[in-house]
């Protein structure tokens, strides 16, 4: 089981990404939601991860790569997918949004 999970709000005009820590069958928020394109969600998440010295660099890279993939998918195909459908594409993340 992963130690961390990205929670994603999949919306029409933006996508928002937050980081949670996994503990058993529950998750605990580590960050607020960072929005794209209103702000640079990737950069904000990176800056937050840089302050968490207890998150190994290799795990931070994986989380940032997932964030890149999610943002790119939203930009290219966002309105074609419901939150439920996009969850099938990014199985290691948790998605909420309109269906």
Predicted regions and their residues:
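The transition from N-terminal targeting/processing segments to the mature protein
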Residues: 1-99
């Amino acid at each position: 089981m992963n130690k961390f999970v990205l929670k994603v709000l999949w919306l029409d005009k933006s996508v928002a990404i937050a980081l949670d820590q996994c503990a058993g069958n529950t998750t605990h928020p580590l960050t607020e939601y960072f929005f794209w394109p209103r702000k640079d969600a990737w950069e904000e998440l990176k800056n937050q991860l840089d302050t968490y010295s207890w998150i190994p660099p290799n795990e931070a890279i994986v989380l940032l790569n997932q964030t890149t993939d999610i943002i790119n998918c939203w930009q290219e195909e966002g309105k074609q997918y419901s939150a439920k459908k996009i969850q099938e594409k990014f199985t290691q993340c948790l998605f909420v949004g309109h269906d």
